Amino acid sequence: MLNRLSHNTVSDTVIADAIAEELDRQKTQIELIASENIVSADVLAAQGSVLTNKYAEGYPGKRYYGGCEFVDKVEQVAIDRLKQLFGAEFANVQPHSGAQANQAVFLALLQPGDRIMGLSLAHGGHLTHGSPVTMSGKWFDVVSYEVDPETHLIDMEKVREKALETKPKLIVAGASAYPRQIDFAGFREIADEVGAYLMVDMAHYAGLIAGGHYPNAVPHAHVTTSTTHKTLRGPRGGVILTNDADLAKKLNSAVFPGNQGGPLMHVIAAKAVAFGEALRPEFSDYAGQVIANAQALAKVLIQGGLGIVSGGTDSHMVLVDLRPKGVTGKIAEIALERAGLTCNKNSIPNDPEKPFVTSGIRLGSSAGTTRGFGVLEFEKIGALILRVIDALATNAEGDSAVEAEVREEVAALCEAFPIYVS
């Protein structure tokens, strides 16, 4: 998948140089950001195609522009493949992002001032699930549920109590920093009990669901949204799925003309390619390996004295509590990047530090698994992370010698598992 990459010459030297530098960074660093992945050369080629020239407001067979015969074909393929992947009756592939997909759902189902309930951002939720700095937090009356302070798991009985008490019109299930399985069936039972819509944002888990290694949200949710990158290994974009024909009409109208104008046909083509890749039998093997690798990484970090939120992972994601080492997420992120390991600082439940400092880091196994890393490589990555963190525990500025040694070992791993070979 990653063994061929055709270089289209960019004559703008400033941009060409930046692209070349970014390509080198991706080749020589180990990507551990849980929301990132490495797409195939085919996905890149589709996204860089002449489809970027075409305006196509509307939907296949019902456009506001002429000349849409071939982009209709592309979008319909994307829709059909997406429905097949998740067992959905209806799908919209036009949202430009996961945030746009969520916003379209709110536009379709809610009125300003309606009450929504989602996982608190401080406990692993996402900005678009009701954070006060976002449209969802400004336009709607938001109540939040949290994870258990001891287990760091979603307590479904507490969610039920909160829903019965507050009677939201829409409940959001999904997260940006929750490594465990989510009880989508349980959420639907609660939504039905209080007369609410259930929207599942499966952005982080979509590829694992497509591969059959994480519970499928689509049979339980009124509406399911997702990004198409992350574990699904497609271009950056969003999608919406439902099994309800009446909701599908409202959702389509909310995407266009309600929330967006012309669709990005080159991105939709890349989505179609990625969905086709995810339908292949080997993608299930990939998804299973992603989880096995994340679990191996978590085990090594626990053995090395770090805390792991919820004690482990059922997904691609490992949320690390750095407090046992007396290190903040901010300095850990910087030091690990110096050593060739890219991750992000991340708040942990009930984090005493500010969001720009944090007590944790979030790690992901998706991109490394795409490179070809297995359990042994992720165990080694865990040991490398510990060396950098232990050096920070001794000296907050880090140990340049340790970081240089780790950087050499990272380079060797990357060389053994190359990406985008010309």
UniProtKB/Swiss-Prot annotation:
Pathway noted in the entry: One-carbon metabolism; tetrahydrofolate interconversion; Amino-acid biosynthesis; glycine biosynthesis; glycine from L-serine: step 1/1
Location of N6-(pyridoxal phosphate)lysine modifications: 230
Domain of life: Bacteria
Catalytic activity as recorded in UniProt: (6R)-5,10-methylene-5,6,7,8-tetrahydrofolate + glycine + H2O = (6S)-5,6,7,8-tetrahydrofolate + L-serine
Keyword presence, Transmembrane: no
Cofactor(s) needed for function: pyridoxal 5'-phosphate
Biological processes per GO annotation: glycine biosynthetic process from serine; tetrahydrofolate interconversion
A molecular-function term among this protein's GO annotations: pyridoxal phosphate binding
Compartment list: Cytoplasm
Family: Belongs to the SHMT family.
Subunit text: Homodimer.
Name recorded for this polypeptide: Serine hydroxymethyltransferase 2
